[in-house]
């Protein structure tokens, strides 16, 4: 079964596809490309599992991911369609804007610093845009060396290691504020965003 809402599937209708479990796959036609779909897999009319595509193909947006579906230590599952991570929302195509709006995302939590931030397009229709800039002091030691072309082999690896340590130690306030926002039910769905969608997020 297919639905744009991962918590509501119309199982009274015919499923969009069926398959023998031994086949291992089935094909679902994608006729409406402006919507994100979730799928209810029903095994032998007894066992259900909700799944969805982890990565969303959005032109000019890096690393857009749905964080739903991961299992917790107590055997539960993070709900699909509630928390996303992403790169920055700049230079969007009309199709990408439509897809994002159709996901119903209410809150953008933006970890970019004022040095990086470009105002997010109002066309996306977020109710809340919350800027929680992370620490950028790790750049201070690197930029002068880049300007003088003094980088040596292995410096990039060391820089990335220092970067992640700096993010944890220097961005505690930003991450604390993020978790406080995650506690507000009216903020959902939420997207966590930074420049590339893979460091702070």
Task: Describe the function of each predicted region.
Residues 188-201:
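A phosphate-binding catalytic loop at a beta-strand-loop-alpha-helix junction
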Residues 1-191:
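Cys-dependent protein tyrosine phosphatase-like superfamily
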């Amino acid at each position: 079964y297919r639905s744009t809402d991962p918590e509501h599937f119309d199982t009274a209708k015919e499923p969009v596809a069926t398959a023998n479990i031994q086949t291992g796959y089935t094909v679902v036609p994608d006729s409406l490309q402006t919507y994100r779909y979730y799928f209810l897999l029903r095994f032998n009319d007894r066992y259900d599992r909700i799944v969805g595509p982890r990565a969303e193909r959005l032109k000019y947006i890096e690393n857009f991911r749905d964080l739903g579906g991961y299992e917790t230590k107590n055997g539960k599952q993070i709900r699909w369609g509630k928390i996303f991570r992403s790169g920055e929302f700049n230079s969007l195509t009309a199709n990408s804007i439509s897809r994002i709006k159709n996901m119903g995302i209410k809150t953008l939590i933006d970890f970019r610093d004022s040095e990086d931030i470009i105002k997010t397009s109002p066309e996306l229709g977020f109710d809340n845009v919350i800027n929680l800039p992370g620490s950028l002091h790790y750049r201070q030691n690197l930029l002068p060396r880049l300007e003088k072309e003094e980088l040596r082999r292995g410096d990039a690896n060391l820089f990335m290691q220092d970067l992640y340590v700096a993010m944890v130690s220097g961005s505690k306030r930003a991450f604390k504020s993020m978790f406080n926002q995650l506690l507000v039910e009216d903020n959902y769905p939420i997207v966590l965003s930074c420049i590339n969608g893979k460091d702070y997020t």
